[in-house]
């Protein structure tokens, strides 16, 4: 039982960004020692800043913010630091250094037992029993496996950004601070690892603040939502679904200008309330409704959609046909004998651990890499659209609005005229943000510009690589609605189970041992099928295995 009523306090806290934008305005909050809190707000509302203040990193604020005496704070930033002089396992073991010191001292005394040290040994044994430290190495192994950490002896310098985050998260969870601050913890995790993390955090013996766009995660872990809105911190008791209902009521009272946001919120709430069977039926119905989607896309007239996608030419019966495709990387076989046929209107969710081969598959489908065996064929009318991640694709001297709109006040999406500033605003570039130079944008902001440009170009098969990573919940919700109404196909790499459940008609799953499963249905239905095929243990995340490949 914590010795304090609240683990953290804020009194009259204010934070202003350079240039004068007030991001936190006279915030008064206190956090219970076992509270699980999801932090929501549009990009730029101060979510990461709030965590940095609570972690003691950002001290440039007025008012008061302090942690309870004796409480430790652990913080996972979006780009965590590791000790480059240590291996992966040595970095993880830093999180249990204090626990290991207790075991080491006990073992040292046991090796040199004497009456003088008997009392200390007895006290240490009680502490080891109470903290369940006898199997500490096994606990570390389990956490590293569940988070699919790189090999124990891997050098930190060679790790990707996603691998660094998994190592840092593993270290932090094993350390078990009284206040855990997590900034986008699900980024770079596959769907099954996210499900494991949910279970771990639900029973975590401390307070947690989570910044995430993953709505299932928010529903399954949190008991409170803290919404940052125009400088205010507004707490709601309940999970994401509860917040969604309360938010809808608040918007209805505030202004008729919020009509389009209310519509999108209502659609999402209706989807959440539907039974799993009804959700799965909806994903199948999309394939049969392709002609209706095409007709709607070509209508004139007003729309309340926040994001619209320009539709390309009508798709024929053949969209993408993959036959017997295999692909190796070095001596590892990533994909072994994959075949599938994508029907018109299909939306494919591509899932699997980092490094499994998802991006390689994407590159083959786009013709940027060739398979080692098998064929990939596109239908005659297919016009693919994808985000070019190279920096050269954007002009650093243009403003955000110029880059997205091409300098045109009106954009033509199908037969609809759309105000270009409104379109740009839908990707959460509002007001003065539209005048920012592209050259000063963050990586996430650049990706939103790329996405906005690509969606107005007129493709009929979209390729999206982790589109949810750089979007706040509001923009993500608008993108989902746009994709639901999109008269085309999409192939989407994502770990966001809510996104996959709501949109996917098919799943391509990298299941390990070089096998990629093609499944008709959404993510929820795929998980049920996987348990039937491979057993309940198949949903426990583990480091991926490959077949050996020899040419």
Explain the meaning of each model-derived region:
Residues 1-259, 303, 309-551:
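ABC ATP-binding cassette signature C-motif
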């Amino acid at each position: 039982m914590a010795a304090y009523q609240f683990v953290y306090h804020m009194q009259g806290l204010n934070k202003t960004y350079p240039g004068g934008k007030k991001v936190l305005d006279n915030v008064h909050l206190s956090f219970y020692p076992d509270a699980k809190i999801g932090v929501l707000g549009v990009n730029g509302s101060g979510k990461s800043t709030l965590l940095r203040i609570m972690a003691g990193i950002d001290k440039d604020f007025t008012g008061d913010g302090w942690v309870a005496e004796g409480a430790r704070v652990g913080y996972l930033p979006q780009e965590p630091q590791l000790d480059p002089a240590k291996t992966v396992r040595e970095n993880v073991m830093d999180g249990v250094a204090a626990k290991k010191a207790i075991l080491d001292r006990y073992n040292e005394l046991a090796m040199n037992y004497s009456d003088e040290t008997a009392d200390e040994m007895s006290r240490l044994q009680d502490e080891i029993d109470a903290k369940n430290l006898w199997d500490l190495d096994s606990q570390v192994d389990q956490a590293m496996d569940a988070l699919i950490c790189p090999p124990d002896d891997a050098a930190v310098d060679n790790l990707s950004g996603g691998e660094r985050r998994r190592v840092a998260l593993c270290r932090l969870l094993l350390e078990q601070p009284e206040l855990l601050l997590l900034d986008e913890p699900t980024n770079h995790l596959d769907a099954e690892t996210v499900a494991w993390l949910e279970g771990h955090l639900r029973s975590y013996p401390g307070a947690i603040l989570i910044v995430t766009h993953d709505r299932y995660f928010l529903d399954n872990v949190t008991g409170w939502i803290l919404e940052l809105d125009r400088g205010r911190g507004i707490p709601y008791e309940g999970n994401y679904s509860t917040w969604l209902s309360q938010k809808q009521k608040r918007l209805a009272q505030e202004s008729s200008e919020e009509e389009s946001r209310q519509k999108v919120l209502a659609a999402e709430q209706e989807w959440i309330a539907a039974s799993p069977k009804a959700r799965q039926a909806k994903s199948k119905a999309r394939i049969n409704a392709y002609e209706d989607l095409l007709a709607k896309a070509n209508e004139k007239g007003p729309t309340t959609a926040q994001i619209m996608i320009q539709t390309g030419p009508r798709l024929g019966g053949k969209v993408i046909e993959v036959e017997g495709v295999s692909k190796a990387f070095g001596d590892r076989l990533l994909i072994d004998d994959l075949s599938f046929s994508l029907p018109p209107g299909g939306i494919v969710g591509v899932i699997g651990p980092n490094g499994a081969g998802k991006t390689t598959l994407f590159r083959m489908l786009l013709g940027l890499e060739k398979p080692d065996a098998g064929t990939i064929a596109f239908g005659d009318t297919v016009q693919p659209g994808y985000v070019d991640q190279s920096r050269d694709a954007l002009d650093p001297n243009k403003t955000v609005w110029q880059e997205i709109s091409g300098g045109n006040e009106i954009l033509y999406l199908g037969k609809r005229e759309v105000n270009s500033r409104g379109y740009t605003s839908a990707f959460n570039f509002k007001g003065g943000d539209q005048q920012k130079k592209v050259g000063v944008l963050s990586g996430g902001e650049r990706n939103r510009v790329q996405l906005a440009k690509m969606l107005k170009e007129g493709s009929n098969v979209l390729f999206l690589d982790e589109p949810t990573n750089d979007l706040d919940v509001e923009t993500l919700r608008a993108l989902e609605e746009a994709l639901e109404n999109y008269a085309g196909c999409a192939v989407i790499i994502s770990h966001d189970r809510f996104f996959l459940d709501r949109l996917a008609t098919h799943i391509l799953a990298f299941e390990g041992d070089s096998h990629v499963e093609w499944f008709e249905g959404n993510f929820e239905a795929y998980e049920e099928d996987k348990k039937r095929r491979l057993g309940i243990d198949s949903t426990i995340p583990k480091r991926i295995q490959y077949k050996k490949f020899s040419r």
